[in-house]
């Protein structure tokens, strides 16, 4: 089901990210935040509908849907990037290339780049070819934990506690 208003928000978010990377304006992170809000809204709704209908969440079905939707394209891009960068990057950077692609492949690149203090504002040299995977890593980590949080809150107090829990998490973050 495609909701036109959400599609418009996605387009706006993508535009913010593109104009940021084109160095037209700052604030591209707002586009990423919009993508996160959209994902959170859609996934929460999906999980709550399943809970109301069945009384549980099929984690297997949930994660299989995420895998089918995200991994083929993500891994294809990583593969093409790895092959291309192997030939285009200096040989002195190949160990970092392998490390960065491996971290992106298991969706922990946000932690790796934070550890090495690599971000878009702090790049003195050639940036990691997969630096953009930090946002996918955050989203995948959300997908890992969110169903458990929603299930726990729903079973303890229904939609009302879910709403309060989301509000509390929002304030704390």
Language-model region placement:
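Membrane-interface helix/loop caps of multi-pass membrane proteins
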Residues: 1-173
């Amino acid at each position: 089901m495609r909701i036109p208003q959400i599609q418009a928000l996605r387009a706006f978010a993508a535009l913010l990210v593109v104009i940021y990377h084109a160095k037209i304006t700052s604030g591209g992170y707002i586009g990423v935040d919009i993508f996160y809000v959209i994902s959170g809204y859609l996934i929460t709704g999906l999980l709550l509908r399943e809970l109301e209908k069945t009384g549980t969440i099929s984690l297997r079905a949930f994660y299989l849907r995420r895998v089918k939707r995200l991994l083929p394209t993500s891994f294809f891009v990583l593969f093409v990037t790895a092959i291309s960068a192997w030939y285009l990057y200096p040989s002195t950077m190949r160990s970092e290339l392998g490390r960065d692609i491996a971290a992106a492949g298991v969706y922990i690149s946000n932690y790796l780049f934070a550890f090495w203090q690599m971000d878009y504002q702090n790049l003195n040299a050639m940036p990691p070819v997969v630096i953009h995977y930090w946002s996918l890593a955050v989203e995948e980590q959300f997908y890992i934990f969110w169903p458990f949080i929603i299930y726990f809150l729903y079973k303890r107090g229904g939609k009302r506690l879910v709403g309060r829990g989301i509000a509390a998490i929002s304030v704390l973050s």
